[in-house]
């Protein structure tokens, strides 16, 4: 029952293209009333739209949309951001190496991004190694820069594929839309200049897998095709249908919002831009599940009410409300006038809000005007209350509307960092914060003494340094000893070098040096 009911859901949820659940159905055309017996009462068949009455049936094959596609086709993808990590080292005189890391961006190529994505998905260690910081090179008393390019893959990044023009829609795209994905160009630009978006499956056309093959019976009247009976046994009318391509496949959009790849000999016009197909998303599937349960419950209530009428031989306004047709199309309307059960042919339409049929107090709008009542009685259990307000039994229950509002408020989508409108990008090509979380931390590093020599070279250098230090110590000690020896000698010379004067016979005072000299000369 449920799989079949899913296929007539578009009949009930005809206004789903507008995003609202039809809370009621009411006749927009109402035929003349005629008296009937209670044995003529019947529960409506909500699985069939009684329409043109074509009788000539012939088998044919067609394609229709898979159950579950109503709003958008999800395309799994990923973003690829190019990052350049730069390591700048400086080695000072004594061998201390200071390393400073910086990150910038570059625009990656699609081929490189595809290879990096395949590495990541396959668990290839080359992807993780590509994200590591570069091993810095260094030279004594020089500044050396070492750079390394990395590709940061962030997934998933889901985009919506528009089946009408095969464009992609996501908030990660600059204008929310990407139309350039094709065989020759398999990527989209994003809000970030150095990030591109690519589909996980390089064959984007495979994402448009929304059709299923079915067999049915074409219904025609003479040479004119009126509609068809699908493989579930449901009749679909072609009245009001228009031509529409989905994912490049030509078909017909029916009045109930469904689509079939059916060709007719009639001259059918192309659909205007506002004529869309009811494409399902997960939220709509949940709502349709509730709709199916509600229809099954309503069917059981109708049968119970009909059984009660037949058993008790009495009819009430409340019981007549269960006999109302729940989907748009032709059906019956029932009422009680002057204690007489009445029936009329009716064509039902969907109602999205109560204001459509209750524009003012005491007015029930049918066919564009206020419908007259008979002693406060309308039809299908609708009556005029003592206070002058129109009372509709179904207005007392808004279960489905509450379910829909609950579903709408409970959707929490997964947001890609670039899809967040509050994201503020840095000026220039400095690395953004959203890629930093996917890369190792960078910070300044200062190494120990390292001159870049091999192990034997280090030992030779240490030995030469120790020998030089020893020679310097010996030299300093030798200098100190010489200084200490010269100081006592100078002190003794200063102690015996006092001036001595003598008085010669001539009475002239001469110095001792002159006296010694003249004495020597005398001796000579």
UniProtKB/Swiss-Prot annotation:
It comes from the Viruses. Disulfide bonds join 43-302, 54-226, 80-113, 178-188, 208-247, 242-271, 363-370. Glycosylated and palmitoylated by host. Glycosylation is crucial for glycoprotein export at the cell surface. The keyword Disulfide bond applies. SUPFAM superfamilies: Viral glycoprotein ectodomain-like (SSF161008). Its main location: virion. GO terms for cellular component: membrane; viral envelope; viral membrane; virion membrane. Residues 481-524 are intravirion. Pfam families: PH_Rhabdo_glycop, Rhabdo_glycop_CD, Rhabdo_glycop_FD. The keyword tRNA processing does not apply. Changing residue 275 to Q: In strain: Isolate SAD Bern original var 1, Isolate SAD Bern original var 3, Isolate SAD Bern original var 4, Isolate SAD1-3670 var 1 and Isolate SAD1-3670 var 2. Changing residue 516 to Y: In strain: Isolate SAD1-3670 var 1 and Isolate SAD1-3670 var 2. It is a single-pass type I membrane protein. One of its GO terms (biological process) is fusion of virus membrane with host endosome membrane. Keywords: Disulfide bond, Glycoprotein, Lipoprotein, Membrane, Palmitate, Signal, Transmembrane, Transmembrane helix, Viral envelope protein, Virion. Belongs to the lyssavirus glycoprotein family. This is Glycoprotein.
């Amino acid at each position: 029952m449920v799989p079949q009911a899913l296929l007539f859901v578009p009949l009930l949820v005809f206004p789903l293209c507008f995003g609202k659940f039809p809370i009621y159905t009411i006749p927009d055309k109402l035929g003349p009333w005629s008296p009937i017996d209670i044995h003529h009462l019947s529960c409506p068949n909500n699985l069939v739209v009684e329409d043109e009455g074509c009788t000539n049936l012939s088998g044919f094959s067609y394609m229709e949309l898979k159950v579950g596609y109503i709003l958008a086709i999800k395309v799994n993808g990923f973003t690829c951001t190019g990052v350049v990590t730069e390591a700048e080292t400086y080695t000072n005189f004594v061998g201390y190496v200071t390393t400073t890391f910086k990150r910038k961006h570059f625009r990656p190529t699609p081929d490189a991004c595809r290879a990096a994505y395949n590495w990541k998905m396959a668990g290839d260690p080359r992807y993780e190694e590509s994200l590591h910081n570069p091993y810095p090179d260094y030279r004594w008393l020089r500044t050396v820069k070492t750079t390394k390019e990395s590709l940061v893959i962030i997934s998933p990044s889901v985009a919506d594929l528009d089946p009408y023009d095969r464009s992609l829609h996501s908030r990660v795209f600059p204008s929310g839309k990407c139309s350039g994905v094709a065989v020759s160009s398999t990527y989209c630009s994003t809000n970030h200049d150095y990030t591109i978006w690519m589909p996980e499956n390089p064959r984007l056309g495979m994402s448009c897998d929304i059709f299923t093959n079915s067999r049915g019976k074409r219904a025609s009247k003479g040479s004119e095709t009126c509609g068809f009976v699908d493989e579930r046994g449901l009749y679909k009318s072609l009245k009001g249908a228009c031509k529409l391509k989905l994912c490049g496949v030509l078909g017909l959009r029916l009045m109930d919002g469904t689509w079939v790849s059916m060709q007719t000999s009639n001259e059918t016009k192309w659909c205007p831009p506002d004529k869309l197909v009811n494409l399902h998303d997960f939220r709509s599937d949940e709502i349709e599940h509730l709709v199916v349960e509600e229809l099954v419950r309503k069917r059981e209530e109708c049968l119970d009410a009909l059984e009660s009428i037949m058993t008790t031989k009495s009819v009430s306004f409340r019981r007549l409300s269960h006999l109302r047709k729940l989907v748009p199309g032709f059906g019956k309307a029932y009422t009680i006038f002057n204690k007489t059960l009445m029936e009329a042919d009716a064509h039902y339409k969907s109602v999205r809000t109560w204001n459509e049929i209750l524009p003012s107090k005491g007015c029930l709008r049918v066919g564009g005007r206020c419908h007259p009542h008979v002693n406060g009685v309308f039809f299908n259990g609708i009556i005029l209350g003592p206070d002058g307000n129109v009372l509709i039994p179904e207005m007392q229950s808004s279960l489905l509307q509450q379910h829909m509002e609950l579903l709408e408020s409970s959707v929490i989508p997964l947001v890609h960092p670039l899809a967040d409108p509050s994201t503020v990008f840095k000026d220039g090509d400095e690395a953004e914060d959203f890629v930093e979380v996917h890369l190792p931390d960078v910070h300044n590093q200062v190494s120990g003494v390292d001159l870049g020599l091999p192990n034997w070279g280090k030992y030779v250098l240490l030995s030469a340094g120790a020998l030089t230090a020893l020679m310097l110590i010996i030299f300093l000690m030798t200098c100190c000893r010489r200084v200490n020896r010269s100081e006592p000698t100078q002190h003794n010379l200063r102690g015996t070098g006092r001036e001595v004067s003598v008085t010669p016979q001539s009475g002239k005072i001469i110095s001792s040096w002159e006296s010694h000299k003249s004495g020597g000369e005398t001796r000579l």
